[in-house]
Structure formats: C-alpha cells, structure tokens
Amino acid sequence: MALTLVLALCACGGAPANPTTGNDATEPNGNTGSTTPVGYTFTYNGYQFGVDMIADAPLENLGEPKDQYTSESCAFGGEDTVYYFNSIQVSTNNEYGYERIYSIYLEDDLVSTEKGISIGNTVAQVKAAYGEPDASSSDSCLIYAKDGMKLRFNLNGDKVSSIAYDML
C-alpha cells in the first residue's frame, strides 16, 4: 500500500480531458488518452496495454480485481483508483469522467515486460534487452523513456526489485 501511495504521489503529467467520439480523448496540452497503447507496453492474458490508455478495455480484460483503493488525487484532479490484480497493480485517474491508466506496477516474477524482463533479473539482462538507460537513471533505478512514458526498473543491488510503467 505504501508503494502505491508513493507511485500516486510521484505521478506527473497533464490531466485527461473529456473523451471524444471515437477511440481517443485529447487533453488540453495535446496528449491523448487512447485505446491503443504507445511507448513501452505490457501484455497480460494476451491483451496489450500501457499507460495513457483509456482504462475500460484493459480493466475489463483483467477481470475482477482482488481489491481496489480510491482516493482524491494529489497529482491530477478527480480521483485516483488503484486496482490490485494477481501479479500487477493498475492505477487510474478519472478527472474528466473516464478512467485513464497512469501507472502499471509489476508485483512479482510471474509477469514480465514485453522483452522478458521480470523481478529478479540482473542489470546486465535489462541492458541486454533494452540497451543503455536514460541519463536520469542511477545505481538504484534504470529508466527508459519513450512516447510520453517511462519504464522504470528499481534495483536492489544488481537485481530488479520492481518494475513500473509510468506517465511522464
């Protein structure tokens, strides 16, 4: 729960706007909440999704959550909801009346990234799969930014201890 609150507090990016007719919703700053994933994506039960997506279809595909927690957002307007599923957490915001994914957190080694990296892999394995990390990386975190989002590998020594997909 504490990690979820940290992720919610660290989230940043533009607030979502009212959905339009069609598959995408455009924010005032030009970003879109979409039904099509961009950037680094995650596949679970055969369904590909990512951050900045309208959450309806991904949440439906994931099934009934084990638990969920809703609170007033401190990073956006509206409310944030964290959905807890087996092996992953999905965080959404509903500022304009629809939910948009702003964070996906991989909880254990039963799930992996699109390139096969999971909790417990080494720094060398992450770099072999994703290349050299962004300059904002450190000894405790490898960061890869792409298309308005970041894929973050938190480290404990030389091993991946958690994986998060976040909006920039």
Predicted regions and their residues:
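N-terminal, intrinsically disordered, polar/charged segments of Gram-positive cell-envelope systems
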Residues: 14-62
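C-terminal motif of bacterial Sec signal peptides marking the signal peptidase cleavage site
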Residues: 8-11
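Surface-exposed aromatic
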Residues: 39-42, 76-78, 105-112, 143-148
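Sec-dependent N-terminal signal peptides
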Residues: 1-5
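A generic structured-segment signal
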Residues: 47-49, 56-61, 100-103, 111-130
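A cross-family detector of function-defining hotspots
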Residues: 22, 27, 60-96, 118-168
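Short, recurring structural edge motifs at helix starts
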Residues: 43-47, 110-115, 138, 150
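A short alpha-helix capping/helix-coil boundary motif
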Residues: 34, 92-93, 102-104
